Amino acid sequence: MRGYFIAGNWKMHKTCAEAVALAQELVRELRGGPHTYMIAPSFTALDAVGKVLRGSNVLLGAQDVSSEEWGAHTGEVSVLQLEDLGVQVVIVGHSERRHGRGENDKLINQKVRRVLESGLRVILCVGERLQEYEAGCTNEVVGTQVRAGMADVCGSLMHNVTVAYEPVWAIGTGKTATPAQANAVHAHIRSVVREMYGAAIAEALCIQYGGSMKAENARALLAEEHIDGGLIGGASLEAASFVPIARSV
């Protein structure tokens, strides 16, 4: 049976001191919780936050990684460096990287494989933009991103893969995906993975929802059959908004 995976992506928020304080509060609040939890602070706070999380049930995540292994790549951070800081999970292909920084499926796949080959876990983000949603292309776009993101990934590594569905059109636009709409896309993602890897791997795959999950809608979303957790942005920046989501299931 799939467990729930509740993850917070802090994006470019929090000073190091603020990140440490929030991490300490979350460790206290989530201690003994029945699910998998993760927080992904900025690179600058990874070391300090990692020390807070050590020995807790909250995993340390990174928001991105270089596709390169090592060497002369100014401004890049390698998976080896992340692993050295105690990072356990890496977010790859977030919509803000795809559409804000021009990352394409080929680069995202390189990052996915780099993370998995290192033995770390990866969260592969997929999702359609507003114009793609309005054109009825959701399944086509998301399916293409899943297939491309997992290209050449061995089935034996799939236990370290989580997929996060981000309907970009539902983030900061005033539009929302209903639980049923989100679940239908999650079911499609699972069917694509079933075609690629077979039923056992597809049924075991954790698929998070990343479309503005909040305490107010978390319970309804997480009650859906194919929604196995959340990749949470704004609501993860305060314990008062993140903990209720984590406790909603």
UniProtKB/Swiss-Prot annotation:
Q: Could you provide one GO biological process annotation from this protein's UniProt record?
A: gluconeogenesis
The record, for SUPFAM superfamilies, names:
Triosephosphate isomerase (TIM)
Record family assignment: Belongs to the triosephosphate isomerase family.
Which coarse location class describes where this protein primarily resides? cytoplasm
Under InterPro entries, the record lists:
Aldolase_TIM, TIM_sf, TrioseP_Isoase_bac/euk, Triosephosphate_isomerase, Triosephosphate_isomerase_AS
Q: What keyword terms does UniProt attach to this protein?
A: Cytoplasm, Gluconeogenesis, Glycolysis, Isomerase
- The gene designation is tpiA
Q: Which residues cross the membrane?
A: none
| Residues involved in substrate binding | N9, W10, K11, G172, S212, G233, G234
Task: Read off the Pfam families from this record.
Answer: TIM
Tell me the PANTHER family matching this sequence: TRIOSEPHOSPHATE ISOMERASE
EC number annotated for this UniProt entry: 5.3.1.1
For this entry, the protein name equals: Triosephosphate isomerase
The function of this protein is: Involved in the gluconeogenesis. Catalyzes stereospecifically the conversion of dihydroxyacetone phosphate (DHAP) to D-glyceraldehyde-3-phosphate (G3P).
